[in-house]
C-alpha cells in the first residue's frame, strides 16, 4: 500500500501513552502469518464490551460515528512498545489506518511499520498536546500530510516532521527493504561476481 505525495484524511485521537503491541492486538489472535484479517481484532480489549460476540464499546473513540472512517491515528508517546510482533502493524493497516502521529515510537515497531508502508510521523510533545486540544475543542478531524516537503497541515498551520529520503521513497512507491534491494539486483550480482573465488564458493547466479 502506498500513500500519495499529499494525503488528506480524517484523524482519530487516542489519548493514551505507552500503548504496547499486546494492546494493539492481543496474543491470542496471532495464529497466522498472512497480513489480512487482523483489523477486526485491533485494540480488541478496548474496542469491545463483549469480546466473544464483538459487541462494540460505544465510549471507545474508534467506535464513535465521527471517527469510524478515520485513516490517521493521533496518539501519545512510546506507541508500539512491548513485543516485536509485526501483527500489530498488520492489524492497523487492515483496519484502515495509514498514518500514525505521535511524539515517539518503539524502535522495532518503527521498522516494522515502514517495512509495511505504515507512515509514522513524529512531532514534539507540545505539538501533540496542541493537536489533542484542537480536536477536543473544535471537533476537527481532518488533517493533510505533505510527504514531499515533510509538513503536516492542521488548522491553517503547518508543522515540520523528519522523514528520511529512503523511507519517503518506500512509502510513496509501496516498497519494503527487500523490494528496494531487488531494484539493485543487477548491480549486486555484478559486484558479487567480481569477488575472487576464495571469498565465495560460487558466483551469484
UniProtKB/Swiss-Prot annotation:
The keyword Amino-acid biosynthesis applies. One of its GO terms (cellular component) is 3-isopropylmalate dehydratase complex. PANTHER family: 3-ISOPROPYLMALATE DEHYDRATASE SMALL SUBUNIT (PTHR43345:SF5), 3-ISOPROPYLMALATE DEHYDRATASE SMALL SUBUNIT 2-RELATED-RELATED (PTHR43345). It catalyses: (2R,3S)-3-isopropylmalate = (2S)-2-isopropylmalate. Pathway: Amino-acid biosynthesis; L-leucine biosynthesis; L-leucine from 3-methyl-2-oxobutanoate: step 2/4. Belongs to the LeuD family. LeuD type 1 subfamily. Heterodimer of LeuC and LeuD. InterPro entries: 3-IsopropMal_deHydase_ssu, Aconitase/3IPM_dehydase_swvl, AconitaseA/IPMdHydase_ssu_swvl, LeuD. Catalyzes the isomerization between 2-isopropylmalate and 3-isopropylmalate, via the formation of 2-isopropylmaleate. Keywords: Amino-acid biosynthesis, Branched-chain amino acid biosynthesis, Leucine biosynthesis, Lyase, Plasmid. GO terms for biological process: L-leucine biosynthetic process. This is 3-isopropylmalate dehydratase small subunit. Its EC number is 4.2.1.33. GO terms for molecular function: 3-isopropylmalate dehydratase activity.
Amino acid at each position: 500500500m502506498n500513500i500519495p505525495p499529499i494525503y488528506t484524511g480524517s484523524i482519530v485521537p487516542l489519548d493514551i501513552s505507552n500503548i504496547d503491541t499486546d494492546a494493539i492486538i492481543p496474543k491470542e489472535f496471532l495464529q497466522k502469518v498472512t497480513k489480512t484479517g487482523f483489523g477486526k481484532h485491533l485494540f480488541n480489549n478496548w474496542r469491545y464490551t463483549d469480546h466473544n460476540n464483538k459487541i462494540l464499546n460505544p465510549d471507545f473513540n474508534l467506535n464513535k460515528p465521527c471517527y469510524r472512517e478515520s485513516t490517521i491515528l493521533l496518539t501519545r508517546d512510546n506507541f508500539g512498545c512491548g513485543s516485536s510482533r509485526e501483527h500489530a502493524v498488520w492489524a492497523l493497516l487492515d483496519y484502515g489506518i495509514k498514518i500514525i502521529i505521535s511524539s515517539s515510537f518503539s524502535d522495532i515497531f518503527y521498522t516494522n511499520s515502514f517495512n509495511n508502508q505504515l507512515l509514522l510521523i513524529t512531532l514534539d510533545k507540545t505539538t501533540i498536546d496542541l493537536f489533542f486540544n484542537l480536536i477536543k475543542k473544535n471537533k476537527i478531524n481532518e488533517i493533510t500530510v505533505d510527504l514531499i516537503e515533510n509538513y503536516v497541515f492542521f488548522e491553517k498551520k503547518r508543522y515540520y516532521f523528519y522523514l528520511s529520503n529512503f523511507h519517503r521513497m518506500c512509502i510513496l512507491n509501496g516498497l519494503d527493504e527487500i523490494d528496494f534491494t531487488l531494484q539493485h539486483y543487477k548491480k549486486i550480482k555484478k559486484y558479487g561476481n567480481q569477488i575472487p573465488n576464495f571469498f565465495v564458493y560460487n558466483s551469484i547466479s
